[in-house]
């Protein structure tokens, strides 16, 4: 037996000697080693001996202790501030802390034992243990209380099996301990409290009609703020009589509006708010409290549910206008063109005033694609924040300034949990270039998604769980307790205005009718709808509460309802003859702009810049501060650019782009370029942001051109297409005088944002009268790089083109690129521009321009002549027009493939004509050019497969042109790759064989 008794002792000795080998201790040992290198006497003798034998380089030891250069300093944050670590459960440390405090109190005579005598050592130990157990219980409520809160108005939710996790007995308290005052050191706002006093505060705070999730937050200040804001004997949900009447009034308006429409337009789709009426007073509170804290503007985005109610009761849209739309009337004046949209997609704007604070509200128009409006709203808000600060701002605007504009997003529960763009937007929320000082998310959680139960629409307990990834606090609240909902909205607004971080309100409610008013929900949710039919409305429940409090009588409530109904009847009558007299899309920042004239084909604007100005900008583009250490390859890049500016020759793609950006910035147009790796450029061509090779400092030549210039921002975005493109589109809606560009890493990846192209960029102006000057740069070109690095799918964008809705271009020269970028800002209207941009042409010896082509009377050319026609030193001299046997029309990089092949073959009777802008199609210009070659064969050549590229789009247009010029050949022949399922081959040998084949077809 003796041997067996010694074994554990030996095992512990071995563990004591080897525990430092445990991987989790590596950081600690590295820090100890660094301390030893600084001062060997600062560590224990055993460690001193150990380190002395290692003999490592002292500098390496210190670097290892510091960790990699890219690590975030002071992270993760050490949790504190509540006597207990939120994460590590280090209760021994807490006990020591409390014991020391109690000893101090005992010494001062502030803490006494049961007999009124000073505390003995034993009593101090017992009191400290009581304190620790109490704090453990408090922490359990903070962590898990929300699971026990009364959140479901219908009472259908299953109660969680809590294993008595919140019971005092679980923490060692018995009823005999309930009268004893326990030291809790101002946790819950009390220094001493009995167990029942603690439970009263904890149950009211965490297990009532509000459930708060905040213990996942790692910032101690944010956690402490929430605790202090909601915990404590005086922190009940309490409203003045006036406040309660205001809530009741808004509820009556919300419910009465839905019921009125239900009677007047029986069965018509309205996606009513019935069951979620508490949203309306909550939104009022957000605007009111925000206004008190400095809020100037709210940009709203929401789905269809409750939209008409928000428009009328919160935004102040006249009811007569809504009733006019219900009877099929247009929402725009008769003289305004547009295809229109259904009434529950429309936007609006208004000013509301509370307590002398004026707040501007704007609701963003959106499609039925759920949640896709979120990034658009964030982008709009960011632009409005930038406009408040001004065009000459620094690139770091304080969040306290940004907080003056609030993006407020309303979500459905199934969509918030289901749509990936939600997570993308949360991912954007804290990033440089995309921060908006916190979005307020309000989930209308009616516990159903069309016909699908939550158990089948998400894998997590709450729809809001995705927001935990960015440590947003989440306020769950019962929608049948309007006071709790308004209180949650108030606290959420205060948190956002204080910390400039996103926050979520998850309002549990229900949908009184089907998904739309013509739908029967009992087919799929019989039990839920049985409960709903028997359930009183929110107005009834709240009215009964206020009657019980003696604040109102039933007659008062009936009178309020009758007055509201009478007002709506008056508005309904007015709606019969209502005529919209003002379309608001050219107000504010858009003043001075107009809608484009379809008939006006020559719309290039004045885009040329004097050579002197270009040279001044060019000089600044290649200058860096004296003490700035440029990478030697970048220095060569700058030297080459300096040479271009000096000679005025050889201007490449990236230089033309920088000159376009620089000239616009000098003229007062901010430039915002966003996308993956845009600072440097995917192909290492741009380099508009330079990095010091010794200290990583940044220098941006485009922001150092001259005093008073507008800002240039290049934003390396997160690895997302959908949210980032939606964000940039939103930005372009709010600031028409900024050139906003989004660049795909490769054009192939742009279809990750297809919804934004389809629902907003191509159709937003026709549906909602919202212009955008957004530029999309999509690298495109077949160079043997395989199916995912070749095609931006040009055909997709061309298929979307109609009614002068956007521009699609595939330009071939730096000069034309320069002019098309400047053209975006130099006309008095805005249109989106989809640009196929080059890859190999970025460094192609022929794809260069001169300063003369950017200045003087130069402008953008929708068609470009054959270089052999007007460049004297070309290897080929073309025949006269009458002798040309074939005209090969093309667009983009394939022109250079054709040109070089023609030169190699010595062909002089084939003319190459470039269509630089594919839409709006340059029909008149093409008639003028092709009239020269009436007898020639016409060929369309493209590098894309036949079922892709521009062929299907351009063929009918070209036939129309040929008919107009009475051409000998009335049909255009196709030359290009054959139709294919995949855009491009991944085999270089096959790529080259295909290229040779279609060049032969075009030129042979």
From Swiss-Prot:
Any one of the GO BP annotations: tricarboxylic acid cycle
EC number: 1.2.4.2
Organism placement in taxonomy: Bacteria, Pseudomonadati, Pseudomonadota, Alphaproteobacteria, Hyphomicrobiales
NCBIfam families listed in its UniProt record: 2oxo_dh_E1, PRK09404.1, PRK12270.1
Any one GO cellular component localisation term in the record: cytosol
Family matches, as HAMAP family: SucA_OdhA
Cofactor(s) listed in the protein's UniProt record: thiamine diphosphate
Transmembrane segments: none
Major enzyme class: oxidoreductase
Keywords: Glycolysis, Oxidoreductase, Thiamine pyrophosphate
Subunit structure: Homodimer. Part of the 2-oxoglutarate dehydrogenase (OGDH) complex composed of E1 (2-oxoglutarate dehydrogenase), E2 (dihydrolipoamide succinyltransferase) and E3 (dihydrolipoamide dehydrogenase); the complex contains multiple copies of the three enzymatic components (E1, E2 and E3).
Source organism of the structure: Brucella ovis (strain ATCC 25840 / 63/290 / NCTC 10512)
Gene Ontology molecular functions: oxoglutarate dehydrogenase (succinyl-transferring) activity; thiamine pyrophosphate binding
Protein name in UniProt: 2-oxoglutarate dehydrogenase E1 component
